[in-house]
């Protein structure tokens, strides 16, 4: 066993293709981030954040932001549904 063989054992196979492995990125995350920037989602997020501030500022309230959360998720997921499968391999 020579020095080159030991180096391959310590660093891997020595194959540059294996050393240049790309980190996999979930396409769902990428598409969601893109969709969240669209006007409809931005407005829904603003309503959700406004509701959250309002509810958080009160010590006792029965109000919650469920409706605003579902509106935001619906808007985002509607956008995602149309774009996600185009980006899959």
Swiss-Prot record:
The keyword Disulfide bond is annotated on this UniProt entry: yes
Database matches in Pfam families: UCR_hinge (PF02320)
Topology in membrane: Peripheral membrane protein
Transit peptide feature, positions: 1-13
Places the protein is found: Mitochondrion inner membrane
Assembly description: Component of the ubiquinol-cytochrome c oxidoreductase (cytochrome b-c1 complex, complex III, CIII), a multisubunit enzyme composed of 11 subunits. The complex is composed of 3 respiratory subunits cytochrome b, cytochrome c1 and Rieske protein UQCRFS1, 2 core protein subunits UQCRC1/QCR1 and UQCRC2/QCR2, and 6 low-molecular weight protein subunits UQCRH/QCR6, UQCRB/QCR7, UQCRQ/QCR8, UQCR10/QCR9, UQCR11/QCR10 and subunit 9, the cleavage product of Rieske protein UQCRFS1.
Chief location category: mitochondrion
Residues with PTM N6-acetyllysine: 40, 83
Family under the similarity heading: Belongs to the UQCRH/QCR6 family.
Keyword Nucleus: no
GO molecular function: protein-containing complex binding; ubiquinol-cytochrome-c reductase activity
GO terms classed as biological process: mitochondrial electron transport, ubiquinol to cytochrome c
Protein known as: Cytochrome b-c1 complex subunit 6, mitochondrial
One Gene Ontology cellular component: respiratory chain complex III
PANTHER family, alphabetized: CYTOCHROME B-C1 COMPLEX SUBUNIT 6, MITOCHONDRIAL, UBIQUINOL-CYTOCHROME C REDUCTASE COMPLEX 7.8 KDA PROTEIN
Physiological role: Component of the ubiquinol-cytochrome c oxidoreductase, a multisubunit transmembrane complex that is part of the mitochondrial electron transport chain which drives oxidative phosphorylation.
Species the sequence originates in: Rattus norvegicus (Rat)
Disulfide bridges in this chain: 35-79, 51-65
Spans annotated as Disordered: 1-27
Keywords: Acetylation, Disulfide bond, Electron transport, Membrane, Mitochondrion, Mitochondrion inner membrane, Respiratory chain, Transit peptide, Transport
């Amino acid at each position: 066993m020579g020095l080159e063989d030991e180096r391959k054992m310590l660093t891997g196979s020595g194959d540059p293709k294996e050393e240049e492995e790309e980190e996999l990125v979930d396409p769902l995350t990428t598409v969601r981030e893109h969709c969240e920037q669209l006007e409809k989602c931005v407005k829904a997020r603003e309503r959700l954040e406004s509701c959250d501030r309002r509810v958080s500022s009160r010590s006792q309230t029965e109000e919650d932001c469920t409706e605003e959360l579902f509106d935001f998720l619906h808007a985002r997921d509607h956008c995602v549904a149309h774009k996600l499968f185009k980006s899959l391999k």
